[in-house]
């Protein structure tokens, strides 16, 4: 019997040159930024940065790092910071968001982290993680800024809402 579970891969220094990073892979105007991000990721892997994606030519991925090394101005010691989390188009509704978030939760447990944090928009933005979905899956809003951003936290990975 064939295994029908989707395959996900984690990018590393060893495979990043031959793998895509989801962001604008079809837009030639973004090539310079795309290559710059790959170079940045190579350096950040040493800080525990993780880029996990669907093993397909799709925008289905999650990026996270120990919050102490996050590029966002958030103080959250002993948490994992989700920097980017995206499931687009035809891949929505197939469990990929759940699966990717589960990978982060398992990493947080292995690393004995206090939980997860992320910055989201107070309104839906195409460039931000889906606030509503994260709230439905165990995150709580702990700070709302007047400039349209909120800080979400999952204090204990035991709070994850199972499907």
Region spans (language model):
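Conserved beta-strand in the GNAT
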Residues: 53, 57-69, 81, 86
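Conserved acetyl-CoA-binding loop-helix of GNAT-fold acetyltransferases
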Residues: 87, 93-108
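Short amphipathic alpha-helix that is part of the acyltransferase structural core
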Residues: 1-55
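Conserved active-site tyrosine of GNAT-family acetyltransferases
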Residues: 130, 134
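A conserved beta-turn-beta hairpin within the catalytic core of GNAT-like acetyltransferases
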Residues: 70-82, 92
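Conserved catalytic-core motifs of GNAT/GCN5-like acyltransferases
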Residues: 119-120, 135-153
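Conserved GNAT acetyl-CoA-binding A-motif
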Residues: 108-123
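Surface-exposed beta-loop interaction hotspot
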Residues: 151-163
């Amino acid at each position: 019997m064939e295994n029908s579970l989707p395959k996900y891969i984690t990018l590393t220094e060893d495979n990043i040159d031959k793998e895509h990073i989801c962001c604008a892979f079809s837009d030639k105007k973004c090539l310079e930024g795309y290559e710059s991000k790959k170079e940045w990721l190579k350096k950040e892997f040493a800080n525990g940065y993780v880029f996990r994606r669907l093993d397909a030519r799709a925008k289905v991925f999650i990026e996270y790092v120990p919050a102490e090394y996050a590029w966002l101005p958030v103080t959250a010691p002993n948490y994992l910071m989700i920097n980017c989390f995206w499931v687009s188009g035809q891949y929505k509704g197939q469990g990929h968001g759940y699966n990717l978030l589960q990978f982060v939760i398992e990493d947080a447990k292995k690393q004995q982290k206090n939980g997860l944090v992320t910055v989201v928009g107070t309104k839906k933005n195409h460039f931000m993680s889906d606030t509503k979905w994260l709230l439905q899956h165990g995150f709580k809003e702990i700070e709302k800024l007047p400039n349209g951003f909120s800080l979400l936290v999952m204090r204990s990975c035991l709070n994850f809402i199972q499907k």
